[in-house]
Amino acid sequence: MANLNQIQKEVSEILSDQKSMKADIKAILELLGSQNPIKESLETVAAKIVNDLTKLINDCPCNKEILEALGTQPKEQLIEQPKEKGKGLNLGKYSYPNYGVGNEELGSSGNPKALTWPFKAPAGWPNQF
């Protein structure tokens, strides 16, 4: 067990460390407050990064090879354009024998009691719509 003198010594060390940290925090905050706003510094850093990347891309020998290859392309198109334009897909009517549907625009299922939409209430039902 620690005696009172040892505890007092440790507490005083912690107190002095805390005071020095408080002074350090104030100094850091003053330093940060005197600098440029964060947005401006971020913009300058981003501009420098963009400039460096464009310089690397422009100086790359592979980029020059690509530009030369693109410059020597044949003037004729190698891929033929389709001759028929504006013709969509030829989709037939719904013909799967599903006896749970019966809309005319989808094709009839052949079931005379099939459900249709909008739903028509049978005779005797209250009119909800």
From Swiss-Prot:
Pfam families hit by this protein: Cauli_DNA-bind
Functional note: Plays a role in virus cell-to-cell and plant-to-plant transmission. Interacts with virion icosahedral capsid and movement protein, thereby facilitating virion cell-to-cell transmission through plasmodesmata opened by viral movement protein. Also interacts with aphid transmission factor, attaching the virion to aphid stylet when the animal feeds on an virus infected plant. Aphid saliva may later detach the virion, inducing release of infectious particles when the animal feeds on a new plant.
Subunit record text: Homotetramer, through coiled-coil domain. Homotrimer when bound on icosehadral capsid. Interacts with capsid protein, and with movement protein.
InterPro entries referenced in this protein's UniProt entry, alphabetically: Caulimo_virion-assoc
GO CC terms, sorted: host cell plasmodesma; virion component
Ranges in a coiled coil: 1-31, 38-59
UniProt similarity note: Belongs to the caulimovirus ORF III family.
Protein name per the record: Virion-associated protein
Subcellular location: Virion; Host cell junction, Host plasmodesma
Positions of region (Capsid binding): 122-129
Organism listed in the record: Cauliflower mosaic virus (strain Strasbourg)
Gene Ontology molecular-function annotations: DNA binding
Keywords: Coiled coil, Disulfide bond, Host cell junction, Virion
